[in-house]
Amino acid sequence: MRRFYTVMTAVALTVATVFSGVSTVQAGGYHEYDVEKYVMNQLSAASVPGVSVSIVSDQKEIYSATFGVDGKTQADYVLGNLTQSMTALGVLSLAEDGEIKLEDDITTYLPKYSALKGVTIEKLLHQTTGIKKETMLDQVKAEGKEGIYQNAYVNYSILGELIESVSGETYEEYLTENILDACGMTSTYSLRQNPEMQEEMSPAYKNYFGYPVAAKYQYNASDQWATVSSGYMISDVKDMGKYLQMYLKEGGDVVNPEDIAGVLQNTVPVINKSKEDSLYGTEEAYGMGW
């Protein structure tokens, strides 16, 4: 979630903004010095408090390091929008098992959202429901133009409820059993599920007039704007390296290759984008959680 962190994932490089001091493991064949020099220069230029870096192949972790204030590669941080990619995989897992169809109307499973009659699960995945960004869960309605991408956390909050309703489990339980365990991810959780982990988390940083200011993350169960499934899963950089490996393996033991291709390549254009939706002036498109 951009109000806490920015998490960016590339094909062979995972960079997650957790704010911690240099700790390096398994450099493999990479030139550590060159990697670290580049990262430190970028941190300084961008006035970023810290960053964690993971470089992986589809078979192993090649390099993992944390730069900044904390000094732990195991530092926990809020995944923000990257949580949505996990939620998308959870929904696709249900579809693979024949529990749902992506073209199904969401009200078939969650009739309480009667204002979304005609909105399909696939539209929620693509965020083309017409729900506006500032919409709260208790006031859900499709006010915008359906079929046009608009980033609204409520879309993925509703998908989290779908997973719970269909599976009969909590979102975290289903994700752990069907996604995280298969990826070997043992340090990914939510504070709703594990409130005792509050003190283990690295602080979030917000930018005030060019200066990073630490802010302790607090899970708010009554938050109607964003929920666990739309932005509040927590992880560390080593687990995120494992998550990236699953994509490099085209789904591995988690979902089939066609679904991974669909998540990444079945996209809708991002138009009328804000600065936070823009990446280096490129043309953006949105898949399912990506």
Residue ranges of each PLM-predicted region?
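Bacterial N-terminal signal peptides that target proteins for export
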Residues: 1-9
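Bacterial N-terminal signal peptides
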Residues: 10-20
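Sec-dependent signal peptide cleavage junction
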Residues: 18-30
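Short, conserved catalytic-motif segment at the N-terminal edge
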Residues: 29-79, 99-101, 133-142
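Acidic helix-start/capping segments at beta-turn-to-alpha-helix junctions
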Residues: 56-58, 105-113
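Short, solvent-exposed alpha-helical surface patches in non-cytosolic proteins
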Residues: 80, 85-89, 109, 119-128
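Short, surface-exposed loop or secondary-structure junction motifs
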Residues: 114-290
